Amino acid sequence: MLCWGNASFGQLGLGGIDEEIVLEPRKSDFFINKRVRDVGCGLRHTVFVLDDGTVYTCGCNDLGQLGHEKSRKKPEQVVALDAQNIVAVSCGEAHTLALNDKGQVYAWGLDSDGQLGLVGSEECIRVPRNIKSLSDIQIVQVACGYYHSLALSKASEVFCWGQNKYGQLGLGTDCKKQTSPQLLKSLLGIPFMQVAAGGAHSFVLTLSGAIFGWGRNKFGQLGLNDENDRYVPNLLKSLRSQKIVYICCGEDHTAALTKEGGVFTFGAGGYGQLGHNSTSHEINPRKVFELMGSIVTEIACGRQHTSAFVPSSGRIYSFGLGGNGQLGTGSTSNRKSPFTVKGNWYPYNGQCLPDIDSEEYFCVKRIFSGGDQSFSHYSSPQNCGPPDDFRCPNPTKQIWTVNEALIQKWLSYPSGRFPVEIANEIDGTFSSSGCLNGSFLAVSNDDHYRTGTRFSGVDMNAARLLFHKLIQPDHPQISQQVAASLEKNLIPKLTSSLPDVEALRFYLTLPECPLMSDSNNFTTIAIPFGTALVNLEKAPLKVLENWWSVLEPPLFLKIVELFKEVVVHLLKLYKIGIPPSERRIFNSFLHTALKVLEILHRVNEKMGQIIQYDKFYIHEVQELIDIRNDYINWVQQQAYGMDVNHGLTELADIPVTICTYPFVFDAQAKTTLLQTDAVLQMQMAIDQAHRQNVSSLFLPVIESVNPCLILVVRRENIVGDAMEVLRKTKNIDYKKPLKVIFVGEDAVDAGGVRKEFFLLIMRELLDPKYGMFRYYEDSRLIWFSDKTFEDSDLFHLIGVICGLAIYNCTIVDLHFPLALYKKLLKKKPSLDDLKELMPDVGRSMQQLLDYPEDDIEETFCLNFTITVENFGATEVKELVLNGADTAVNKQNRQEFVDAYVDYIFNKSVASLFDAFHAGFHKVCGGKVLLLFQPNELQAMVIGNTNYDWKELEKNTEYKGEYWAEHPTIKIFWEVFHELPLEKKKQFLLFLTGSDRIPILGMKSLKLVIQSTGGGEEYLPVSHTCFNLLDLPKYTEKETLRSKLIQAIDHNEGFSLI
């Protein structure tokens, strides 16, 4: 051991020497053949811990700070600690803390301000005593200020006690002192790496390099750009991105070490202790310029001086106050910039020089400073081992974190045979949000040091792998302990306000734990976890949303699937029956799960869909609840102003309606909602008509009205007749049930006539003879023609017809691209829509965007124009102002493609689409429609082609003499299944009025086949109103085939049989 500095009280441990000041490093004979584990320096005393855990002290003992009876100039063992294996010490001005290998803390010395934490009345304690209030807490670090003390626990909890004159306890109170350790609640949840204390200021350092400081700040020693004392922890923002790994404090100054080996200092600089070649104070962290270029691995602060070790040269540098020789430069001069401590320093792994006396060279192991003294633990070049590196924290001094080594240790014990300490270790880790927040860090490239509002610093793949490694069926005791800790200790303590972004990480990682997706834990872990998440204040929730937004899709989907499973689990319980006494808590649980999904859905939509929108669909909803009733309840809640944006406590009193969270509905459920909404509106229209008709009986002035919207049309003039009626129709009448009458036909419209009406009128309206739509050969799709001569009324009519079809639950045959449905739902068409409508043009646009070279102008020769046909002639249209003079290049090509798409789908047809849109929404507007995705709305309007012919057979019903095994029925299905696809589609058209199936699927298409009294010479007859087929009792398969094909080839017109 080398020692230098103030020796006036024997604090260097050199024995009875004549000098009161040692100006340069001097070997201490006492430590020959002794290995030093730690050194603590007070103002006038020093404490040494040897590798065997014994403690020695020397220096002034006026206040009992040595832990034995008298002052000593040579180190003397503290006998009271003989039975303890001490691993670390720290000294205040005149008090000492010692930490043993069990995490227990012993204190002695001056207790004027409660700095010993013993809650006693004695001014001085001369024999070490255990701090009993910390005896049940495993402490890993201690730090002493002059008159206050700090401790860090394995569970990442910080405790403070002693003087609080300047707020150095960080408790936010103006009490002058605390005589017992106080938990620093304001920092709960943060994963800490270190605690440090100066004269009257304090710091904590997180695992990802964030520094929080509080206490005295007269000289800017907190680095907060001012000189105001702080009574609560404050984040030192300027160093957040610097990868700080270690921090130490002097009386009124602070030094911080970076991962790259740089040093920042701030605070009092009157003696040059900041190393900036000046005596100015610094209120902001400033890098020590003269150490740049060297990699520093150790730093230490004395009262008013600073030391730094550079392993590449083996040298120690010091700066600051030198009046007591504490700089080791051979003089008492102050140094304002780093100066080499005198000595024959030898770097680790250096090349031995020939003919040297190895005893005269020193390989530094570790440096210590405090008060006005300094120490260096060294070895000879011959026995030189690697020096300590403060950039690599000692694992024994760190908080619990879930990692590979810890899991392997836990799994190494046979199931059911855990030692108590292992159970305590598991419990401590999973009871602490701070420990979980320090787990699974993204250590590759030191990524976790970038933790902020946009980046979590978490390796999610590591979290998943380690959780799955830990939670295994053959180690149930571990799973049970983890679950109990989460349920009873961690989640109940969560708060809505968090001190820092690092305290949020476990909200990201915990869903990866298999216990969360175990239905046995839904109500005890997953839902309480979701409650804490939903209750987060706006700022932390926003950060969590930011982190979610950059997750890989499978990881994001994992969280969504978890809470979907929770919802399904709860709805199954609801279907079985919830006792009245438990309904309130059930409401709260269900609202929680749905609220979490709502937040995730908001993030998904904001990011342009991390996962497909349909991944939020809960397909079981229709089976588990009555959607129609749910919708009615929701409408009533809206009418009575029940706000579902309350907190979860208030929501518990409001019955849950799934319609409040419509993103969970799949297309079939949405269709049911729309149909329910239409039925409600129809009923309201009918009721209003009945009321008016009743009134007309007593008040002749009031004209009676029809409860239905009646369309009387001729087949030969279907468009003209329909337009005539619809032009005169009031908006309110569109909400009535539609009945269609074909002139000269006897059928009563129970649905089938209406189906054919839509089929025929749309065929007419979309006929090229009107010139209203352009037909695209490549895609076989149509789009509005900007060259039409037709009045916009006709487009308005088509919109009304489409709206009426949806409103009246009828499929219509429209060959529009998906872009139409996007526009109806207020979504923008994209290049993909252009590819669908105009495949060749779309491919060309994609090639333009993908072209890798810079010579786009020469290769493509494009400008911001589009060439269109106009009755045989071509016409050039500018896509932007001065488009003809604007060449398309690499920088603006995306803008050109966007403008092209916008022209085709928007600008060129704006007035025509507006008329269509107005007509459509006149009938079918409303909140429910906007729940649909474009492709879902398309499927609802035109049906889909997801044919399942076996399902059709399975769902068919029989009347009269027929049943499933009747001979005629058996040959009917044989014939049907042998028909080609086109004939099967024709059969659907013949029987139902459409060759497409409803969005609800084949199972919703109920066919009925009944026997007739006629002979085999008769054809099958369809009643499209009822999806009913009259099938004669054919006995021969070929006869049935011939008659069926003949019937479906002639399927237009209605007559009574």
UniProtKB/Swiss-Prot annotation:
Active site annotation, chain numbering: 1025 (glycyl thioester intermediate)
Keyword Transferase: yes
Subcellular location: Cytoplasm, Cytosol
Tissue: Expressed in brain and testis and detected in heart and placenta.
SUPFAM superfamilies in UniProt: Hect, E3 ligase catalytic domain, RCC1/BLIP-II
Pathway it works in: Protein modification; protein ubiquitination
InterPro entries: HECT_dom (IPR000569), Hect_E3_ubiquitin_ligase (IPR035983), RCC1/BLIP-II (IPR009091), Reg_chr_condens (IPR000408), Ub-ligase/GTPase-reg (IPR051709)
Repeat region (RCC1), residues: 1-51, 52-101, 102-154, 156-207, 208-259, 261-311, 313-368
Assigned EC number: 2.3.2.26
GO MF terms held by the record: ubiquitin protein ligase activity
Catalyzed chemical reaction(s): S-ubiquitinyl-[E2 ubiquitin-conjugating enzyme]-L-cysteine + [acceptor protein]-L-lysine = [E2 ubiquitin-conjugating enzyme]-L-cysteine + N(6)-ubiquitinyl-[acceptor protein]-L-lysine
TM segment ranges: none
Location of the HECT domain: 730-1057
Keywords: Cytoplasm, Differentiation, Repeat, Spermatogenesis, Transferase, Ubl conjugation pathway
Record GO biological process: cell differentiation; negative regulation of smoothened signaling pathway; protein ubiquitination; spermatogenesis; ubiquitin-dependent protein catabolic process
Cellular component aspect of the GO annotation: cytoplasm; cytosol; fibrillar center
Purpose: Probable E3 ubiquitin-protein ligase involved in either protein trafficking or in the distribution of cellular structures. Required for spermatozoon maturation and fertility, and for the removal of the cytoplasmic droplet of the spermatozoon. E3 ubiquitin-protein ligases accept ubiquitin from an E2 ubiquitin-conjugating enzyme in the form of a thioester and then directly transfer it to targeted substrates.
Designated name of the protein: Probable E3 ubiquitin-protein ligase HERC4
Organism: Homo sapiens (Human)
Underlying gene: HERC4
